[in-house]
């Protein structure tokens, strides 16, 4: 029996090693197979969001069988002049152009109107013709979504939609909990407003403090406003949000809400807010997934978790198969929400003020802590110690706080009758 158990552990360890250990990719290229009619041609796959790297690759790549995935930043109309010059270099290097369905674009004259239809740039030993049937096969999945839903001249970005879903569902859930607790619904809108303000400003300022402190000197107004002033005034949205900063800010705004508006113990509010934040965090990570950001480290291409993000920013390094760490966190947050919701609905823990919130803190930041082992650094690591990155070090105090809050929650028990009354 011991021999069988040992072999079982050995197999399990091998599977874990296969799935979770980081992988090295020479020259930043991954492998795929280009199927041309009945012929299989091994190709090296390259992608980048940086124009300089894209241009350089056309000149230095010597591999006769190569496929370049063009992402949206490579073919934007706004960059037509520079992009067309780069693509002309590929044409001179005997590459051929294809659309998203692998239809050959013959004798192309690149214009501002057709540049966005180009998706793949391919070079093979034998040129491909329009009569050939072409497809790409890889051992990993390729995640290359559109940025949003186009409604005439307006684009509804999926990242923004995920935030809307998060706050919309949060409003519904908070209303439902206030009804369950027999609390006047006039108190729902203020907590929604203050949480929104705290989340956006706290997440933005937290990101700059922990990951991009140089912005305070280089582009001060971009810290507080969704604009950039470095190369003229430009609307950018808030590019860079940190959950640790959002947490601190929401704690502070909720204190104000608790003492000045609803006049209840802040722990009572935190218990319910934690449930909402758990599911909201899942939506935010889905938004990161659509944006190809907060990605994981390189992974073995045969791992069931391997995913290629052609639209990833070059700040994460080479574009090769990686862990979808956004999804790992999102799944963890959904499970946390389910647990907290069941405890709130089926037990009396909601009357032990702070217990649910403490549990929320422990599990949420534990999820963040462990997923960070598989995640690429987000910019320069402002804090690092003993092999832990900034995100992990910042998570530890929150987990400790969760344990402390759970222990002291015994002192803040209330009855069902007291639950509905403002303090």
Regions found by a protein language model. Give the residues of each.
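A feature for loop-to-transmembrane-helix boundaries and adjacent hydrophobic helices
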Residues: 2-42, 123-423
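Low-complexity, proline/glycine-enriched hydrophobic segments characteristic of transmembrane helices
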Residues: 20-151
């Amino acid at each position: 029996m011991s021999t069988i158990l040992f072999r079982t552990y050995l197999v399990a360890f091998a599977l874990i090693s296969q799935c979770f250990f980081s992988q090295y990719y020479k020259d930043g290229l991954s492998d795929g197979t280009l199927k041309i009619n009945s012929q299989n041609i091994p190709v090296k796959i390259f992608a980048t969001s940086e124009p300089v790297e894209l241009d350089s690759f056309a000149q230095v790549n010597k591999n006769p069988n190569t496929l370049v995935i063009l992402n949206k930043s490579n073919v934007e109309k706004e960059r037509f002049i520079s992009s067309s010059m780069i693509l002309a270099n590929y044409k001179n290097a005997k590459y051929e152009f294809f659309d998203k369905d692998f239809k050959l674009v013959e004798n192309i004259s690149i214009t501002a109107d057709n540049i966005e239809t180009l998706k793949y740039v391919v070079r093979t030993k034998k040129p491909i013709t329009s009569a050939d049937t072409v497809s790409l096969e890889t051992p990993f999945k390729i995640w290359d979504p559109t940025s949003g839903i186009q409604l005439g001249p307006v684009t509804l970005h999926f990242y923004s939609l995920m935030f809307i879903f998060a706050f919309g569902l949060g409003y519904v859930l908070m209303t439902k909990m206030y009804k369950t607790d027999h609390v006047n619904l006039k108190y729902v809108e203020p907590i929604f407003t203050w949480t929104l303000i705290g989340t956006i400003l706290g997440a933005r300022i937290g990101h700059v403090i922990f990951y991009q402190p140089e912005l305070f000197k280089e582009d001060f107004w971009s810290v507080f406003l969704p604009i950039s002033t470095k190369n003229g005034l430009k609307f950018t949205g808030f590019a860079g949000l940190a959950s640790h900063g959002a947490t601190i800010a929401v704690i502070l705004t909720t204190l104000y809400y608790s003492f000045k508006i609803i006049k209840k113990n802040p722990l009572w509010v935190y218990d319910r807010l934690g449930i909402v934040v758990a599911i909201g965090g899942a939506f935010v990570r889905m938004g990161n997934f659509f944006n190809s950001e907060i990605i994981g480290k390189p992974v073995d291409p045969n791992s069931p978790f391997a995913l290629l993000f052609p639209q990833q920013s070059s700040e994460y390094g080479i574009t090769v198969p990686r862990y979808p760490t956004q999804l790992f966190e999102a799944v963890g947050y959904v499970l946390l929400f389910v647990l907290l919701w069941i405890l709130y609905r089926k037990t009396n823990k909601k009357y032990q003020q702070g217990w649910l919130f403490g549990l929320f803190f422990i599990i949420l930041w534990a999820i963040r802590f462990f997923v960070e082992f598989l995640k690429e650094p987000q910019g320069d690591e402002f804090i690092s110690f003993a092999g832990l990155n900034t995100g992990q070090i910042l998570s530890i105090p929150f987990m400790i706080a969760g344990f402390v809050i759970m222990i002291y929650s015994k002192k803040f028990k209330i009855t069902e009758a007291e639950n509905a009354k403002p303090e």
